């Protein structure tokens, strides 16, 4: 009887694993590989930096951190 219980538990784990794989796995956090640093969005919301396409004189002024007389989104 104990062997049957263990067998049923193993079968349940295998079936749930298979269902998880078929659905595409667990929901994963999407990573934005193009972002230079993450605090940029927070700085922009708080008004601590200039958003992209805004005028600038140094990279520290821009939320994206890239200044060429205006804030650029990418380097």
Curated annotation (Swiss-Prot):
User: Hey, what tissues is this thing expressed in?
Assistant: Expressed by the venom duct.
Q: List the disulfide bonds.
A: 49-63, 56-67, 62-71
Q: Name one GO molecular function term.
A: ion channel inhibitor activity
Keywords from the named record:
Disulfide bond, Knottin, Neurotoxin, Secreted, Signal, Toxin
Q: Name one Pfam family in it.
A: Conotoxin
Q: Which domain of life is it from?
A: Eukaryota
- Cellular location(s): Secreted
Q: Which residues form the signal peptide?
A: 1-19
Name where it mostly resides: secreted
Q: Which residues form the propeptide?
A: 20-45
GO CC annotations, alphabetized: extracellular region
InterPro entries from the xrefs? Conotoxin
Cite the domain annotation text. The presence of a 'disulfide through disulfide knot' structurally defines this protein as a knottin. The cysteine framework is VI/VII (C-C-CC-C-C).
What family classification does the UniProt entry report for this protein?
Belongs to the conotoxin O2 superfamily.
Q: Under what name is this protein listed? A: Conotoxin TsMEKL-011
Q: What is the lineage of its organism?
A: Eukaryota, Metazoa, Spiralia, Lophotrochozoa, Mollusca
């Amino acid at each position: 009887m104990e062997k049957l219980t263990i067998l049923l538990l193993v079968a349940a784990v295998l079936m749930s694993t298979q269902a998880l794989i078929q659905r595409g796995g667990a929901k994963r956090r999407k990573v934005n590989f193009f972002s230079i640093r993450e605090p940029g969005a927070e700085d922009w919301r708080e008004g601590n930096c200039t958003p992209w396409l805004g005028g600038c004189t140094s990279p520290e002024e821009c939320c994206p951190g890239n200044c060429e007389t205006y804030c650029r989104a990418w380097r």
